[in-house]
UniProtKB/Swiss-Prot annotation:
Listed transmembrane segments: none
Lineage of source species: Eukaryota, Metazoa, Chordata, Craniata, Vertebrata
Name of the protein this chain belongs to: Cortactin-binding protein 2
Listed GO CC annotations: actin cytoskeleton; cell cortex; dendritic spine; FAR/SIN/STRIPAK complex
Main subcellular location of this protein, as a coarse class: cytoplasm
Organism annotation: Loxodonta africana
Compartmental location: Cytoplasm, Cell cortex; Cell projection, Dendritic spine
Pfam families: AAA_lid_NAV1, Ank, Ank_2, CortBP2
Domain of life from the UniProt record: Eukaryota
Length: 1661
């Protein structure tokens, strides 16, 4: 039929079109795989849009043409045989068609169906195109926005460019002006520089001239001084000769008179002889001759003018009886003078005698004192006159020190003394004075200073020889020395007469005489020495002379008249009685011995006056006052220490007036007995008297007081002891007055080295620590100038030896700076601080080295301060003082430096130590001394990173390079057990941590400190967060590091093969010991499990010691502990080391212990475990009692077996270890018996799995779980510490900066491990997580980072890539049909799964491994090919998502898929879930953790067991619509698009996992869930482990974990249980001992997504 034939044509054409469409679709599919829309440019997108529009138009035209063509063909075929002319045929056709309607097939295919099919296809294409156009349009909009922003930025750029040009123009103009000004200024600078040079040249010339003038002036001054001395000497000689001649003249006149009388007598005798009697003249002549002889030695002539008679010669034998009663009488002149008190009212010191062999100034009295009645005042007129008989000249040599002290002679033997003294009539007493007229020659006044020093040498304690000036000298011996002494006394008295007012005053009453006993009596004779004037009782008072009224503005107050006991038989020559106290002379004791005996205080009947600040002694107007120089104590030797020492003689008593109150101890001063041979001119040589002071002394009246402070300073600066003592005796004078520069009198005296002036000022209570304007004290000045005597004196008066000036200079620093060895020694013996630093950071060591003074440096380093401040015997040599002179001869190491290493290594502002200074200046000797100190650090850098060797001269460099030092490596050794259990490839058996420097002088204490410090610094360095070497941690004083290791962790130290412990000392020094034993290294052994400690385990594994101790406590306390974590987390090592430690602890207390290790595999069954427990006595029969044996069972690799099957029957007996909870086990012979676990059994297990799932959760609550998370301690920092320890070992304890390639390589390996685990956790593949064990074998090779990259490629290909591939395939197929489908998926993955695996490997490789590699990019490209998956193109990941979408996904679904998503796990078995019914949801993006109580957990477990079978049936019945491959690709896309991986701590462990259910109508439970907007479909599951970093977990609670995927479960949850769990969750508190429940993110989003899904599915119904 034609209709049939026509109907076949459309079929054929349709088939061809279908084939063409299929071909086009196949081509399009192939093109899509290679075509990436995301990578097209703007022009390419436009071209694509135009092509697509043209294609649509062409399709529309083709459709219209096909419609028209088919319509014509159909009409022709249908109605071609009919026409309108025959209606009957049409009726017949209609009839036939109606009749055969049911039988007849259609003539051709319905065009409408074809069009509908075409339109449906076009609609699909249009939808796809619309989506691409929408995406392109959005990108185009973004592009336009960016264009607008770019234009705005360009406009701003143009504006800024214009401004910049303007500013450039302005700046250019300014720069040109500045350049011109700079040129002008440079010219001016040059001119000024030339002028300055000229001025400097002139200045230099002037300086030279000034220096020449100064030299000439100094020479002239010296010449004038010499000439003046010569003139004074000549004047003194002239005066002496004049006095001698005058005395000779007087004697000759007297002799002439005698001769005249004799002539007269002879004439009379001749006359008488002429007259007759021949016998009488022969008898009278001898008698007269005898009389003449006696008269020649009798008392001198007494003229009618002179009423005061002084005994000048030996008394006549025929004297009256009153002479015997008063053997020591002093004549008095009532009309001209007043009696003078012999001693001051404040005199209280028994002064030791003076032993001066070469001086003539000691005046010795030999007299017999009488004891008057108590009512009589014991006084002397005119002082203790030396005119008493007998007299001893000063030239008499002193007795030896061992001479016995003379005894006091009673008055009964006075006649004997007089008779003995008569034999010395030829020795003239030096107290006779020639008469002087009031108008004294000024030359005599000027020479007074010269005479005073020698005249007063007679009695340093103030005794003077005075007589009335009007009395002539009686004839005595013609000795020149006596004449010279007489002349000096005459000048002194004359000057005293003319310098004082002619006013008489009485002596102060109540002042008894204190006596000092001379040690120089004549042969067999007794001599008494009267005491000197007293000293002011004012702190440490000086020996002050009697106050001269001529120097005071106010006269001394009047005193009661002195009572004098007169003899009636001799009224004109009556003298006061003198009572002298005799004391035994000190012959062997040091100076300064004082006796205070207040029991012997005499009672005075005179009225008592209060003490005054100074001593006022009235003087006779005739000039009988005590001279000021009589007590100046020139050249006196001070006592060693001010204070009370032992008395001179216990039998001697000291007379002290009761009116005197003592405030402090007094340092007695006397002439030096330690320096025999001191010259008489000590005052002149020590005082430095200047002629400029002469006019003051030449003036007759008193000087004004206004200029006295300045005069005091001048006297102290010039060393004028005379003037200084006179000034100090005045009242109202400020002795602490300082001039403009702040210099006090004490400062000036100390600076110029005037020891006597310093002593006077100190006794006068001058401020010893007064500082000038620069902060320098007198001690500083004396130490800087090198005046050791002044320094010694100031130190004795408690000067501040550590006083620092404004610049920080101490006296020790100044002494070292100027190289004053004696001052340094004195200061060090006084205990000064050697470590005081100046403002510039210099110490005394710097100062000593800077001057190159070897002796000063040796003193600083080796001189020890004495244990006691007072050296009782100064002559004994100090055995521990470093010998400065023989330092080179002493054996090295015999003297230990006293300065610490910190002081030797102290750096100044520039970072220079003393060694830097010595080396740079070429002071080789100083550098050698510094190098002898064991603590010197020659490698210390300054601020410019220069060592001592860098700045040293050639000689010093040679010295540094050849130092006597041993460099011995310090190592920490690992035990064999730790190496075997840990893996010998992972770490070296010995780690070198430092190189010890041992020198000859190193002591065992220094060696111990060095070893302990090196260990402490090493432990701190490897446990720190950054890279820093041992030099950087010396300031850290913490005893333990963050990993818990310290000095207490050391078990023993091996010096070669000899064991040594810190603090132990051998007879030999460390240098000799190590040399002798040939020790090449020092090995440290840490306390390990064998000693019941875990320190060695901590160092081997880098797990902090507190955590290991906590693990050990858990095992000992709970008995059942399981260590779990990712593979490679050292679970087996930790369990084994803890077991070893427990074993040795138990054995130490007397128990036997055994460790049983069992490796669990898939074939390990429960029966084998029962047999293991019974065989090792862990399970014992109920009837049997437990023994004392301890058993530790370690079950390794429990992840290879099912925990519920293996340990299910042991849970209750293990938790309750008693006979009350037994378990029954069947033996091999068929019988059964009850067993129980005893308390002496410990069970530890290890699981290399990050989380538990399924039925294994039932075991969880019965054990204590220790979780070893990769992102928490101890695993988080373990790899870092381990690799850092490797680097320390390679560099022998010295680490470079973080920029060093080795440090970068170690940091890269560490980041690879962290980033890899972070990415794997983000992908939801916890089974692929790696512990740090695989990375411990990372090679650390300095300078060869390629080795580390090669090692990383091997690790990637052998371990990481296979684990990642397996985990990705497991995740991609986890929701497929369990059983065969999953197995086939792993063995034969589909193309999509292979693409996902390759993409995951490529992304992990680029994001985690290659990122941060220290190699350059060009070099790194050579190694990329060695990594598996490195060549996979990432563009396929983007195109993969377009063909992976399911039907019905629209724009809304895509919006949902970009939200945070929960990754699904690979585990087929379900876990319990807890939904969140809260409307608000969880706002926090991170995981919230809530705790359920024990009841809720138990109810869940019971529900889990009841509904287990129902869950499996539901899983088989449900058709899951989500595609995990697409989800993985989304995650990979997000990871690939992120520029940098976020911090692992901020990555959420899960995202919302949204699923659609196409067959929800077949599941009533889930259709109800969908319709209920408050009930989410996908349940939130419980993660099995806690996310806390705590390692102590509860036995009875479930745990959750961050960073791992969850297991899907679709169990129908009753509302009541859900509500109960929700309420319990809200009530519970967060705790590590409760179950951790993981709640997902916002539930509102999930509900909204499900409602959208429902709307999408409605049109399909």
């Amino acid at each position: 039929m034609a209709t049939d034939g026509a109907s076949c044509e459309p079929d054929f054409s349709r088939a061809s079109e279908d084939a063409a469409e299929a071909t086009a679709e196949a081509t399009a599919e192939a093109a899509k795989k290679e075509f990436d829309v995301d990578t097209l440019s703007k022009s390419e997108l436009r071209m694509l849009l135009s092509v697509m529009e043209g294609e649509l138009e062409a399709r529309d035209l083709v459709i219209e043409a096909l419609r028209a063509r088919r319509k014509e063909v159909f009409i022709q075929e249908r109605y071609g045989r009919f026409n309108l002319n025959d209606p009957f045929l049409a009726l017949q056709r209609d009839y036939e068609a109606g009749a055969r309607e049911k039988e007849k097939k259609p003539v051709c295919t319905n065009p409408l169906s074809i069009l509908e099919a075409v339109m449906a296809h076009c609609r699909k294409m249009q939808e796809r195109m619309s989506t691409q156009l929408a995406a392109a349009e959005s990108r185009q909009k973004k592009l336009e926005m960016e264009k607008l922003q770019l234009q705005a930025l360009e406009q701003e750029h143009k504006k800024l460019a214009a401004r910049l040009e303007e500013e450039r123009g302005k700046n250019k103009h300014v720069v040109l002006m500045l350049v011109k000004e700079c040129k002008q200024l440079s010219g001016k600078v040059i001119e000024e520089a030339q002028k300055v040079e000229e001025v400097m040249a002139q200045l230099e010339e002037e300086k030279k001239r000034t220096n020449e003038l100064e030299e000439e002036l100094s020479t002239e001054k010296r010449r004038s001084t010499e000439m003046e001395a010569q003139m004074e000497k000549q004047l003194s000689e002239f005066d002496t000769e004049r006095e001698q001649l005058r005395a000779k003249l007087n004697r000759e006149e007297a002799h002439t008179t005698d001769l005249k009388e004799e002539i007269d007598k002879m004439k009379k005798m001749i006359e008488q002889l002429k007259r007759g009697n021949d016998s009488k003249p022969s008898l009278s002549l001898p008698r007269k001759v005898k009389d003449r002889r006696l008269v020649s030695v009798s008392v001198g002539t007494e003229g009618p003018v002179t009423r005061s008679v002084a005994c000048q010669t030996d008394l006549v034998v025929e004297s009256t009886d009153h002479v015997k009663k008063l053997p020591l009488t002093v004549p008095v002149k009532p009309s001209a003078g007043s009696p003078l008190v012999s001693a001051s009212a404040k005199g209280n010191v028994v002064r030791p005698s003076v032993d001066r062999q070469a001086s003539h100034g000691d005046l010795i009295l030999s007299s017999v004192p009488t004891v008057p009645p108590p009512s009589v005042n014991k006084t002397e007129e005119n002082g203790p006159s030396t005119g008493s008989t007998p007299d001893l000249p000063s030239s008499t040599p002193p007795l030896p020190n061992n001479t016995a002290p003379p005894a006091v002679q009673p008055p009964s033997i006075a006649s004997q003394n007089y008779s003995q003294a008569s034999s010395l009539h030829s020795l003239h007493s030096p107290c006779a004075n020639a008469s002087l007229h009031p108008g004294v020659n000024p030359r005599i006044q000027a020479v007074r200073f010269r005479f005073q020093g020698n005249a007063n040498d007679q009695d340093q304690n103030g005794n003077t020889t005075q007589s009335p000036p009007s009395r002539d000298v009686s004839p005595t011996s013609r000795d020149n020395l006596v004449a010279k002494q007489l002349a000096r006394n005459t000048v002194t008295q004359a000057l005293s007469r003319f310098t004082g007012p002619q006013v008489g005053a009485s002596a102060r009453p109540g002042a008894p005489t204190t006596g000092d006993i001379s040690t120089h009596p004549p042969v067999g004779r007794t001599s008494l020495k009267t005491s000197g004037v007293a000293r002011v009782d004012r702190g440490n008072p000086p020996p002050i002379p009697p106050k001269k009224p001529g120097l005071s503005q106010t006269p001394s107050p009047p005193h009661p008249q002195l009572k004098v006991i007169m003899d009636s038989s001799r009224a004109s020559n009556a003298g006061a009685k003198v009572d002298k106290t005799v004391a035994s002379p000190p012959t062997s004791l040091p100076q300064g011995n004082r006796v205070i005996n207040e029991e012997n205080l005499p009672k005075s009947s005179s009225p008592q006056l209060p003490p005054k600040p100074s001593i006022d002694l009235t003087v006779a107007p005739a000039g009988c006052a005590v001279s000021a120089l009589a007590t100046s104590q020139v050249g006196a030797w001070r006592a060693e220490t001010p204070g009370l020492n032992q008395p001179a003689c216990s039998d001697s008593s000291l007379v002290i007036p009761t009116t005197i109150a003592f405030c402090s101890s007094i340092n007695p001063v006397s002439a030096s007995s330690c320096r025999p041979g001191a010259s008489d001119s000590l005052l002149v040589t020590a005082s430095g008297w200047s002629p400029s002071l002469t006019p003051l002394l030449m003036s007759g009246g008193p000087a004004p007081l206004a200029g006295r402070p300045t005069l005091l300073q001048q006297a102290a600066a010039q060393g004028n002891v005379t003037l200084l003592s006179m000034l100090l005796n005045e009242e109202g004078l400020d002795i602490n007055y300082s001039c403009e520069d702040g210099h006090s009198a004490l400062y000036s005296a100390a600076k110029n080295g005037h020891t006597d002036c310093v002593r006077l000022l100190l006794n006068a209570e001058a401020q010893v620590n007064a500082a000038d304007k620069n902060g320098f004290t007198p001690l500083c000045a004396a130490a800087a100038q090198g005046h050791d005597k002044c320094v010694e004196l100031l130190i004795a008066y408690r000067a501040n030896i550590n006083h620092a000036a404004d610049g920080g200079q101490t006296p020790l620093y100044l002494a070292c700076k100027n190289g004053n060895k004696e001052c340094i020694k004195l200061l060090l013996e006084a205990g000064t601080d050697r470590s005081v630093k100046t403002r510039d950071g210099w110490t005394p060591v710097h100062a000593a080295v800077d001057t190159g003074n070897v002796d000063s440096l040796k003193l600083l380093m080796y001189h020890r301060a004495p244990a006691c401040g007072d050296r009782l015997n100064e002559e004994e040599p100090e055995s521990d003082v470093f010998d400065l002179d023989g330092g080179g001869e002493r054996p090295e190491g015999t003297v230990k430096p006293v300065v610490p290493a910190d002081l030797i290594n102290h750096a100044d502002r520039e970072g220079w130590t003393a060694a830097h200074i010595a080396a740079s200046k070429g002071f080789k000797n100083c550098l050698e001394i510094l190098c002898q100190h064991g603590g010197l650090e020659p490698e210390r850098n300054d601020k410019c990173n220069r060592t001592v060797h860098d700045v040293a001269t050639d000689d010093c460099k040679h010295l540094l390079e050849n130092l006597n030092a041993l460099k011995i490596p310090l190592r920490i050794s690992m035990s064999e057990t730790q190496r075997d259990s840990f893996g010998s490839d992972d770490f070296e058996c010995e780690n070198t941590i430092w190189a010890l420097t041992i020198r000859r002088q190193t002591s065992w204490d220094d060696f111990s400190k060095g070893v302990i410090q090196a260990l402490t610094n090493h432990f701190q360095a490897i446990s720190s967060d950054g890279w820093w070497s041992l030099e950087d941690v010396t300031f850290n004083n913490t005893t333990e590091s963050s990993i818990g290791l310290g000095a207490s962790s050391v078990l023993s130290i091996m010096l070669g093969s000899v064991s040594w412990s810190p603090g132990q000392s051998f007879a030999q020094s460390p240098w000799d010991f190590l040399k002798k034993n040939k020790a090449e290294q020092v090995t440290v052994l840490l306390s390990g499990p064998q000693e019941g400690c875990l320190s060695s385990v901590t160092y081997a594994s880098m797990i902090p010691l507190p955590m290991l101790q906590n693990y050990l406590r858990l095992v000992e306390q709970y008995h059942n502990v399981i260590f779990h974590g990712p593979e490679g987390s050292l679970q087996d090592y930790i369990a084994h080391q803890l077991a070893l430690c427990m074993k040795h602890r138990q054995m130490a207390v007397g128990f036997s212990c055994e460790i049983v290790r069992a490796e669990v595999d898939a074939a390990f069954c429960k029966e084998q475990l029962v047999d293991l427990f019974i065989r090792n006595a862990c399970l014992i029969p109920v009837k049997q009692s437990p023994g004392n044996k301890k058993v530790i069972v370690i079950l390794e690799n429990l992840e290879k077996s099912s925990l519920s099957e293996l340990l299910g029957d042991f849970l209750a007996p293990l938790e309750n270890r008693s006979t009350e909870s037994p378990c029954t086990f069947q033996k091999g012979n068929g019988t059964s018996e009850c067993y129980y676990f005893h308390e002496n059994c410990f069970l530890m297990g290890t699981i290399a799995k990050a989380c538990l799932q399924g039925s294994d959760l039932l075991v969880q609550q019965h054990f204590r779980w220790v979780q070893l998370r990769w992102d928490g301690e101890p695993m988080q920092g373990l790899l870092q510490r381990f690799l850092r320890r490797k680097a320390v070992n390679k560099f022998r304890g010295k680490l470079s900066s973080p920029r060093d390639p080795v440090c970068k390589t170690v940091d890269w390996a560490l980041s690879v491990w962290r980033q890899l685990n972070s990415c794997l956790a983000r992908l939801g593949t916890p089974e692929a997580l790696l512990g740090p064990k695989y990375f411990l074998s990372c090679p650390v090779v300095p300078g060869h980072a390629q080795a580390t990259v090669k090692w990383m490629s091997k690790l990637w290909n052998a371990v990481i890539a296979p684990r990642v591939q397996e985990a990705i395939l497991s995740k991609a197929s986890v929701k497929r049909q369990p059983g065969l489908g999953q197995t086939n998926a792993k063995k034969h993955p589909s193309q999509g799964q292979q693409a996902v695996v390759k993409a995951a490997l490529s992304i992990l490789l680029n994001k985690a491994v290659l990122h941060g590699c220290p190699l350059p990019r060009a070099e790194l490209d050579q190694y990329i090919a060695e990594f598996k998956g490195g060549s996979f193109p990432l563009s396929i990941v983007s195109s993969y998502s377009s063909c992976g979408k399911k039907k019905g996904e629209n724009g809304a679904w895509r919006k949902v898929s970009t939200s945070p998503r929960k990754k699904s796990g690979r585990f087929p078995s379900p876990t319990w879930s807890k939904p969140d019914l809260s409307d608000e949801g969880i706002k926090n993006k991170t995981v919230s953790q809530l705790n359920c109580n024990r009841n809720a957990s138990l109810s869940r477990q019971k529900c889990l067991e009841n509904d287990l079978s129902l869950t499996l049936n539901l899983d088989q019945r449900l058709s899951l619509g989500s595609d995990d491959e697409a989800d993985l690709v989304k995650e990979l896309q997000s990871m690939c698009s992120s520029k940098s991986e976020s911090d692992i701590s901020k990555i959420a462990d899960s995202r919302d996992d949204l699923r659609r259910f196409d067959s929800s109508r077949n599941s009533p439970a889930f259709s109800a869930t969908v319709n209920n907007p408050r009930m989410p479909v996908s349940q939130k599951e419980v993660s099995p482990l806690s996310s806390h970093q705590t390692t102590e977990c509860s036995n009875s609670k479930l745990k959750t974990e961050l960073g791992v995927s969850r297991v899907k479960s679709f169990l129908p949850v009753p509302r009541s249980k859900v509500a109960q769990c929700s309420q319990n969750t809200r009530r519970s508190s967060s705790s590590s001992n409760t179950r951790q429940i993981e709640i997902n993110n916002n539930s509102k989003d999930e509900i909204w997504n499900l409602r959208k899904n429902e709307q999408v599915e409605k049109p399909n119904k």
